[in-house]
């Protein structure tokens, strides 16, 4: 293991990934868009090129909705969302902090909110896929 990286995984361990240990963990945010508010995850921004899927890439399923630009990645076995590629900034991933092994998630009880519900919708009645 590289001490310059933080390691994480889904609940069942089928999907494992790493991110740079130098990321500012105090920059974690919640989002209040229709998907994020339902999953309740605390997310951390990370340059997309710095996210490494260490194992289980074949176990990831992808979910896109509305504009079909943002891609949300879930383990096909346990259903945990590990990360997503953003619609507003495609070069940035949102990493689910709850998946990072070495972090005490209790330290993130009070986290600033990003106003995802303010994002423009193409069609509020669009069929979800």
Question: Which stretches of residues belong to each language-model region?
Answer:
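A short Gly-Trp-Pro
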Residues: 1-9, 14-129
């Amino acid at each position: 293991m590289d001490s310059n990286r933080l390691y994480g995984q889904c609940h069942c361990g089928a999907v494992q990934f790493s991110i740079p240990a130098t990321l500012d963990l105090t920059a974690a945010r919640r989002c209040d868009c229709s998907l994020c508010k339902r999953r309740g995850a605390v997310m951390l921004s990370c340059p997309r090129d710095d996210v490494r899927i260490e194992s289980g890439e074949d176990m990831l399923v992808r979910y896109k909705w509305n504009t079909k630009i943002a891609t949300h990645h879930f383990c096909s076995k346990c259903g945990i969302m590990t990360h997503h590629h953003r619609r507003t900034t495609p070069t940035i991933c949102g990493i689910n902090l709850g998946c990072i092994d070495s972090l005490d998630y209790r330290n993130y009880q009070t986290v600033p909110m990003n106003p995802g519900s303010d994002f423009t919708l193409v069609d509020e009645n669009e069929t979800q896929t």
